[in-house]
């Protein structure tokens, strides 16, 4: 498959603010000293062993945003866990702050949203999913620097903390790729990669999820007005149907009104 699928995970640093007390504090814009920024990212192309990693140890994240925008501009599909609500909006927001033009629009596959919609897991976190799905690389917790301490030590320029952040970020991307591939046959809203592969000029019948030509027709799919051939992909396991209906007597067919 030559469709460019980017598996992506970003990490952000917290805002630095002045506050009067520890709890129940409403922070006004004037209290913000430094705004939250993207501190690192890890990314890889689907099925490629190469992993891209970059961190930002400065007070200005423009360089890392330029790198991210360049990757997004090259991608056709982006896989991210909670990407619709976190990763992509964070990148867009920081790009806007720096006056960077938007990349080419991409399709987003949000594995967190898919887990919430399609499955009844006790948790939709990447850590839990990697455990319950028995992934080879399970998302782990922090090691020497637990929780917020990791980000705090990175801001203090602790080299050990930066190394731990790098390992944490890269492992997240490896885990995310495996979770995505396990979920793939269940994703009913997945972009049609066959259409993207051929730019609409299909010469071979292939699975719209994984672009495999190992298609096994099994029965029929029905709507209120049509009958279609139904198939299962023998590579990813996903189900689909043909676009054209096979029932001919459409003029004599009635449908429900109320």
How should these model regions be labeled?
Residues 47-132:
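Conserved DEDDh/DEDDy metal-dependent 3′-5′ exonuclease domain
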Residues 206-210, 233-236:
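Short cysteine-rich clusters marking metal-coordination/redox-active sites
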Residues 1-72:
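Conserved RNase H-like, two-metal-ion catalytic cores of nucleic-acid enzymes
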Residues 234-256:
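Short metal-binding segments enriched for Cys and/or His
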């Amino acid at each position: 498959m030559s469709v460019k699928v980017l598996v992506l995970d970003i990490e952000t640093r917290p805002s630095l603010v002045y506050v009067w007390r520890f709890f129940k504090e409403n922070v006004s814009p004037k209290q913000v000293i430094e705004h939250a920024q993207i501190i690192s990212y890890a990314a890889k192309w689907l099925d490629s062993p190469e992993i891209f990693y970059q961190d930002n140890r400065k007070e200005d994240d423009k360089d890392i945003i330029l790198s991210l925008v360049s990757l997004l501009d090259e991608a056709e599909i982006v896989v991210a866990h909670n990407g619709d609500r976190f990763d992509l909006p964070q990148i867009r927001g920081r790009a806007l702050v720096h006056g960077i033009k938007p990349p080419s629009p991409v399709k987003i596959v949000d594995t967190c949203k898919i887990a919430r919609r399609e499955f009844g897991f006790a948790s939709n976190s990447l850590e839990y999913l990697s455990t319950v799905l028995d992934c080879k690389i399970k998302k782990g917790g922090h090691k020497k620097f637990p929780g917020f301490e990791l980000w705090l030590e990175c801001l203090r320029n602790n080299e050990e903390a930066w190394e731990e952040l790098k390992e944490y970020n890269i492992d997240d991307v490896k885990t995310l790729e495996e979770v995505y591939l396990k979920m793939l046959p269940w994703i009913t809203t997945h972009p049609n990669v066959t259409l993207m592969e051929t730019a609409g000029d299909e010469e071979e019948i292939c699975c719209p999820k994984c672009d495999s030509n190992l298609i096994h027709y099994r029965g029929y799919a029905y709507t209120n007005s049509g009958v279609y051939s139904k198939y299962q992909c023998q590579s990813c396991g996903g189900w689909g149907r043909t676009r054209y209906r096979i029932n001919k007597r459409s003029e004599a067919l009635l449908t429900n009104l109320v």
